[in-house]
Regions:
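PLP-dependent aspartate aminotransferase-fold enzymes
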Residues: 87-186
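Hydrophobic "anchor" residues on beta-strands that sit immediately upstream
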Residues: 37, 186, 218-221
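Glycine-rich loop-to-alpha-helix module at the N-terminal edge of alpha/beta enzyme cores
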Residues: 9, 38-122, 126
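Short acidic, glycine-rich surface-loop motifs adjacent to enzyme active sites
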Residues: 182-198
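Active-site-adjacent loop/helix segments that line or gate small-molecule/cofactor pockets in enzymes
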Residues: 1-27, 81-82
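Active-site and channel-lining beta-strand-loop segments
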Residues: 20-41
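A short, flexible beta-alpha/helix-coil linker loop
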Residues: 45, 68-69, 168, 191-195
Length: 221
């Protein structure tokens, strides 16, 4: 019985998969299936793990970490890997910032919206059509790429307003007709829209969003 057939018996059909392949090994950009085939993975992994399979540097780093500790609660003690990564991210992003780690992008987005509302004391969030930010109730509320994600779960988080990606001129109308800028806690945007079609914005778009947010005391996520 294949992995796919076994999964049908014990796992609910809550997440679709692109194939029915069961894989047992991988190397570089290839995976080895349970029936011995070598299949090219054009993504070389997925999401934050698109580094290929068994990358020697990644494997060595994992081994070194296993030799010290597998996991420790960051809300209990500090550890070198946690602090070192935070320092590196601060360095790469200009130095005048701080870092907090989350389990997933959806949780990071939920946390960012909570923080923006807490700091600004404002209710509104502006998101972009065709965006994807996650499947929690909070991140689903700002996801505009597929109505199927939202089906059966509404009402979602209130005070979410939609804008078109790659368009700065619309914001005068949004602030005049939909929500005043002093009521907007944050604008959340993908630097490159993924599910919207891998849309790379015009160079001036993100800079323009930054200026709009700075001018009105809005957080940019």
């Amino acid at each position: 019985m294949s992995m796919y057939e076994r999964c049908q018996k014990v796992m609910p059909a809550v997440a679709n998969r692109a194939t029915t392949l069961g894989v047992v090994d991988g190397e570089g950009c290839y995976v080895i299936t349970e029936d011995g085939r070598k299949v090219l993975d054009f993504a070389s992994g997925v999401a934050v793990n698109n580094l290929g399979f068994k990358n020697p540097e990644v494997v060595q780093a994992i081994r070194e970490q296993l030799d010290t500790m597998i996991h420790v609660g960051h809300n209990v003690v500090y550890n070198e890997s946690y602090v070192k990564l935070a320092e590196k991210l601060v360095e790469l992003t200009g130095g005048d910032t701080k870092v907090y780690f989350s389990n997933s992008g959806a949780e990071a987005n939920d946390g960012a919206m909570k923080l923006a509302k807490y700091v600004t004391k404002r209710p509104g969030i502006i998101a972009f059509r065709n965006s994807f930010h996650g499947r929690t109730i909070g991140s689903l509320s700002i996801t505009g790429s597929n109505s199927g994600y939202r089906k059966y779960y509404e009402p979602l988080m209130p005070a979410v307003y939609w804008a078109d990606y790659n368009d700065l001129e619309q914001f005068d109308a949004i602030f005049e007709k939909l929500i005043a800028p002093e009521c907007v806690a944050a604008i959340i945007v993908e630097p490159v829209q993924g599910e919207g079609g891998y849309v790379v914005p015009k160079p001036e778009f993100l800079k323009g969003l930054r200026k709009i947010c700075d001018d009105h005391g809005i957080m940019l996520i």
